[in-house]
Amino acid sequence: MYSAQSSISKLTNLCEISSVEVGQHFYWQIGGFQVHAQVLITSWIVIAILLGLAILATQNLQTIPTSGQNFVEYILEFIRDLTRTQIGEEEYRPWVPFIGTMFLFIFVSNWSGALLPWRIFELPHGELAAPTNDINTTVALALPTSVAYFYAGLRKKGLSYSGKYIQPTPILLPINILEDFTKPLPLSFRLFGNILADELVVAVPISLVPLVVPIPMMFLGLFTSAIQALIFATLAAAYIGESMEGHH
């Protein structure tokens, strides 16, 4: 009897140690509104990291680039080539800053979830995590992409842009409209689901076993996080290119 109670007690303690809080939020009360503090705090940190790196990268630029300048130029060329491939040679240039901002913010946000020890900072409710670990952030990233999609099409084609909704036949009008207005959903839910699952897969083993064992999972998480940033940026650019080409 004592052995059974001892085993149950150990199992309970193990479950408490390995627990990961999901869906618990810490709010700031500002006026009559509740502001999701966790997302704002981590987003500000990510933005500060990006601004700091940008300032460091643009200091002392030289005609013959150093290794650090070469690295930054490689990133910029990668974003430029990605945008050009998806949007096209003639129209891609104005969209490079938008696609680059999306890619870099998501990339750093995703990696922050794997590399920064967010959970050592205690909050009254919930835990700090990567900004993209929250559906509010991923939706906030997907909505501007949807707006950019419609803006690009209207800017290029004017009111004739709406004619694509009755192609190839007017019967498809409701389906074509629904397709366009639901584009933010797969973007936001794919990013949110993958980053949340990645953090949970890494967090539980780390809480159960020594640090060395989950290291392969952490590297896998870094790879997955980078791929998710690339997928989001590629799809955003592809949507914009599609709206200007006027075909599905």
From Swiss-Prot:
Pfam families: ATP-synt_A. GO terms for molecular function: proton-transporting ATP synthase activity, rotational mechanism. Disulfide bonds: none annotated. InterPro entries: ATP_syn_F0_a_bact/chloroplast (IPR045082), ATP_synth_F0_asu (IPR000568), F0_ATP_A_sf (IPR035908). The keyword Ion transport applies. The chain crosses the membrane at residues 37-57, 96-116, 134-154, 200-220, 221-241. Its main location: plastid. Key component of the proton channel; it plays a direct role in the translocation of protons across the membrane. F-type ATPases have 2 components, CF(1) - the catalytic core - and CF(0) - the membrane proton channel. CF(1) has five subunits: alpha(3), beta(3), gamma(1), delta(1), epsilon(1). CF(0) has four main subunits: a, b, b' and c. This is ATP synthase subunit a, chloroplastic. It comes from Anthoceros angustus.
